[in-house]
């Protein structure tokens, strides 16, 4: 099992991808000195008697209410309990682990004022496989992801629900079974745990990684469709793409050339009368390249956000100050999530057009619906309809979340990002995308089978062989849903990407 050491402020996308895929999480012990220094600053601020937001005052609209020193621990505990107001289905355990890892990375920067013992308690939860149950609904993405992170924090203090070794139960029971004790929160700790963009960032990162899997598999399926339709490789000539200069476009064109290199099908129709291919074949570098640039841009934003400190107020140890700001506002995450959603839509859209092309004999020159005996067999007729349905569903889901805002907290929090809403949809969109790409893979493999005596490139034949281990070639009609699910799983598991060698991605 891979272990990712969280080095606050120095994490890269590949680290978060490893955590998403199940890596063990460890906080770097070298972060302790900075954390201890910030906690000491909090202690000095309280001892000074100065009113500091969130340390010895109420929260939000109640910030003018001063809290007595003997009630500071109660203040933090009640903050957690009152803000644990989420609803809806629980987030997947992989998301919860990612949320907790992101929170460790943020707290470990030494600008939040929590004690190292509280960070160690979060680490202990992860080590013992005690994961808070976090409802998926209830955050507007400012002031941070308050409700989801309150549910995460509640498990630390023995409130709410958690899972232990996959079993859902009261958090107090989960802690007991794991041999752990509830945390007694110190000054500012509840606020530091609740305030931040870690839930929306975790959801957006997960969506990014899964859409990237769909993107890379779609390069394989798109290349296979070129061979199935006896399309041309000429539009992928590097000279075309260098004249436009977009990095993603250049990278995608190179990838398609590599995937099709050595194809016997391509060489069999050199000099044919067909002048130009339809856009869904010919313009893959332009469309998928723009998608790649968009995903890379979103990835860069999320990488920065994952390294950020996003609670409030922030603690500056060099001057012993606590300064209130607005790093909790998740607008960058909201924009990134919207970009990822757009990218998922476009990948699926161009894949669906190639499915339509391959199943239409008037355009592809292949048997109707890719069945050797049309009429008695319907072939890929309804598989295409399924792809069309999912592509349209993704279009509906892609409406930008970031353009929405609604005031909350008695108008103190009067502009919000909706980042969590925007990021939550991404995994479902990615799942839909994986199905669509899987269907195109099936169509492309079936289409190339009709070119008797000819083979595709060595790379594509290897990918096709991997697919055929899960889904045999089609003769007469058979139950289709299982084949689609198996093809989808190959996309999700990146099995075909491994066959294809190095393909361009977000990093």
Swiss-Prot record:
**Chief location category:** cytoplasm
Q: Single GO molecular-function term?
A: histidine ammonia-lyase activity
- Any one GO cellular component localisation term in the record: cytoplasm
Q: Which Pfam families match?
A: Lyase_aromatic
* BP terms from Gene Ontology: L-histidine catabolic process to glutamate and formamide; L-histidine catabolic process to glutamate and formate
Q: Describe the processing and modification events after translation.
A: Contains an active site 4-methylidene-imidazol-5-one (MIO), which is formed autocatalytically by cyclization and dehydration of residues Ala-Ser-Gly.
Keywords per UniProt: Cytoplasm, Histidine metabolism, Lyase
Where's it found, cell-wise? Cytoplasm
Tell me its EC number(s), please. Answer: 4.3.1.3
The protein's matches in PROSITE patterns, at most eight in alphabetical order, are given as: PAL_HISTIDASE
Cross-link 5-imidazolinone (Ala-Gly) lies at: 142-144
Q: What is this protein called?
A: Histidine ammonia-lyase
């Amino acid at each position: 099992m891979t272990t990712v050491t969280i080095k606050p402020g120095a994490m890269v996308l590949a680290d978060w991808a490893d955590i998403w895929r199940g890596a063990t999480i460890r906080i770097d012990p070298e972060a302790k000195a900075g954390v201890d220094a910030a906690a000491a600053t909090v202690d000095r601020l309280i001892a000074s008697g100065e009113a500091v937001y969130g340390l010895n005052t109420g929260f939000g609209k109640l910030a003018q209410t001063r809290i007595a020193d003997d009630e500071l621990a109660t203040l933090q505990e009640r903050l957690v309990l009152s803000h644990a107001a989420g609803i809806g289905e629980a987030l997947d355990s992989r998301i919860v682990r990612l949320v907790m890892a992101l929170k460790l990375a943020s707290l470990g920067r030494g600008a939040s004022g929590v004690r190292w013992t509280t960070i160690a308690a979060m680490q202990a939860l992860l080590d013992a496989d005690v994961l808070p149950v976090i409802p998926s609904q209830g955050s507007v993405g400012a002031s941070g992801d308050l409700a989801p992170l309150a549910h995460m924090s509640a498990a630390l203090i023995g409130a709410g629900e958690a899972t232990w070794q996959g079993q859902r139960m009261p958090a107090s029971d989960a802690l007991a079974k794991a041999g752990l004790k509830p945390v007694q929160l110190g000054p500012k700790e509840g606020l530091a745990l609740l305030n931040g963009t870690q839930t929306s960032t975790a959801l957006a990162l997960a969506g990014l990684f899964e859409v990237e899997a769909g993107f890379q598999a779609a390069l394989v399926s798109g290349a296979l469709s070129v061979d199935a339709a006896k399309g041309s490789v000429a539009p992928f000539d590097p000279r075309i793409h260098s004249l436009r200069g977009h990095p993603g476009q250049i990278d995608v064109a190179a990838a398609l050339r590599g995937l099709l290199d050595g194809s016997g099908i391509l060489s069999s129709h050199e000099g044919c009368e067909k002048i130009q291919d339809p856009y869904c074949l010919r313009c893959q570098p332009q469309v998928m390249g723009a998608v790649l640039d968009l995903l890379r841009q979103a990835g860069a934003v999320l990488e920065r956000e994952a390294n950020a400190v996003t609670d409030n107020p922030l603690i500056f140890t060099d001057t012993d100050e606590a300064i209130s700001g607005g790093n909790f506002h998740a607008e960058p995450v909201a924009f990134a999530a919207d970009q990822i959603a757009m990218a998922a839509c476009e990948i699926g859209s161009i894949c669906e057009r190639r499915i339509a092309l391959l199943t239409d004999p008037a355009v592809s020159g292949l048997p109707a619906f890719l069945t050797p005996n049309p009429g008695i067999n319907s072939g890929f007729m309804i598989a295409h309809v399924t792809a069309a349905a999912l592509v349209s569903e993704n279009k509906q889901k892609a409406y930008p979340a970031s353009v929405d805002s609604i005031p909350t907290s008695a108008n103190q929090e009067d502009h919000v990002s909706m980042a969590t809403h925007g990021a939550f949809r991404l995994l479902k969109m990615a799942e839909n995308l994986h199905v669509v790409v899987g269907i195109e893979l099936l169509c492309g493999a079936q289409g190339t089978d009709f070119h008797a005596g000819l083979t595709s490139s060595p790379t594509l034949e290897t990918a096709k062989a991997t697919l055929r281990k899960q889904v045999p070639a089609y003769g007469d009609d058979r139950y289709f849903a299982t084949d689609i699910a198996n093809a989808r799983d190959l996309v999700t598991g990146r099995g075909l990407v491994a066959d294809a060698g190095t393909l361009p991605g977000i990093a």
